[in-house]
């Protein structure tokens, strides 16, 4: 018997713990949550935090942080322009940069434009509850068609002012040297004729002559893109929807809150998943989720929710995934078993990035920089690298 066999007071008395104020919880975190409502959170510096800076000053420096939830992009942007916010990075899209830069002097704030790690992705619900849609979305020819239907250069010019780089999603960002150049640009060429030919092969034909394709069984086919500006900019979504409409796949779009989006994504209710995604090599070396169904978590871009459920439940729930999903899972395990930079690591890194990318499951468009906003009254603000 040892100390691990003795429940701590918090574990021993869960009924008492449930009534504690947030600030009463013991914590090793730099900040403690002292208020949590539907309107936001308030954080207070942990007075017992165990770290100091190189001069011996207690960390963290800032005593309180007041985080407010503003889901409406226009209202959020207005508050930023008016200088009512001290710091903001998440949910600030590059498309808003001109308006923010115009108001910087009068608003008393600065705007950095920094390289991002992630990029906006689109994917189709391969475990959709509608079986006819599931068949279409699961057909790699459909996914390839929808990828080459996108004019990424136009997306870069219009949504990102030419500041981005056209690239495919390869699972690791930035793409390491072991990723072949052909994989980095796989299915990124703009080829609407090729897209139309592939869609014809899938069996999506315009039966009634209205300019939009029906499902192979003759039923109406329409997709909706629910998106939140925390994960992707509205200008890109509008462009993508237009380009898919141009090849006869009827596509609409609607802005929702991040919570609404995540709830729909996790419940397998979306047609199209749209959110940015990107993890550097150092993270992928320790966290395999990008290469294992459902290829992400609740807070970022996922795909194949019912594939993940099937694997997690040993087949008692969900939908059985194709063999390549298992092969990819085994591959990331192999990759992580070797030291980064070794020949074995690079060999398996090339295999898994190639395997994921060639499935065209997660469709990349443009990797663009992201704005970082801070009020000038916030001193000692460093220049971010990413």
Task: Locate predicted features.
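Gly/Pro-rich hinge or "lid" segments in bacterial periplasmic/extracellular proteins
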Residues: 1-59, 64, 74, 191-201
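Ligand-site clamp/hinge motif
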Residues: 18-19, 49-99, 241, 248-252, ...
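Detector for C-terminal structural segments
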Residues: 25, 31, 35, 39-41, ...
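A bilobed periplasmic-binding-protein/Venus flytrap-type ligand-binding module shared by bacterial periplasmic
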Residues: 46-48, 81, 119-141, 158, ...
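Short, conserved helix/loop micro-motifs enriched in His/Cys and acidic residues
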Residues: 60-64, 174-178, 214-228
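Alpha-to-beta junction loops
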Residues: 76, 81-91, 106-107, 240-243, ...
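Acidic, glycine-anchored loop motifs typical of Ca2+
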Residues: 208-211
